[in-house]
């Protein structure tokens, strides 16, 4: 994560970096409204074939790694946003539409296609796996 962040900062030279995290119980609010929320999604595929930890151990390890990463980011010129019962997607949507950032060029870095809907004249989506930008000017398609 830190290596990718460093590379993107070198290439994009941002004025400000905001990282959004899922808050505790982030999807609970949506699940209360729609019990089928996130049903049928494929489990996250790990980038390794050998499983040395149980699923519970992997989750604990993921939480520990995220906590350590957040601690390290506290020493960097990065703004981190997280709120209980709020998903990172909602935070990103709020920030891109916030009057505070009106007139700014905003780049969302994610492989999540749902962010296409946030693309406008000021907001583009960078899909790191494809290494391509998507923008409203091109109908949400990658450039």
Question: Could you describe each region identified by the protein language model?
Answer:
Residues 131-143:
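A short, charged helix-loop
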Residues 1-109, 115-134:
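Noncatalytic, basic helical substrate-engagement surface that gates or grips nucleic-acid strands
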């Amino acid at each position: 994560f830190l290596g990718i962040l460093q590379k993107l900062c070198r290439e994009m030279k941002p004025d400000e970096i905001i990282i959004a995290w899922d808050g505790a119980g982030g999807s609970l609010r949506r699940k209360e409204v729609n019990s089928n929320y996130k049903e049928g999604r494929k489990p996250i595929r790990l980038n390794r074939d050998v499983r040395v930890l149980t699923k519970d151990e992997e989750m604990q390890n993921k939480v520990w790694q995220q906590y350590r990463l957040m601690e390290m980011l506290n020493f960097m010129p990065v703004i981190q946003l997280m709120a209980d019962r709020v998903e990172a997607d909602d935070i990103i949507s709020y920030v891109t539409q916030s009057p505070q950032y009106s007139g700014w060029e905003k780049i969302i870095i994610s492989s999540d296609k749902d962010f296409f809907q946030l693309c406008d004249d000021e907001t583009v989506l960078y899909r790191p796996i494809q290494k391509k930008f998507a923008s409203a000017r091109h109908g949400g398609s990658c450039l």
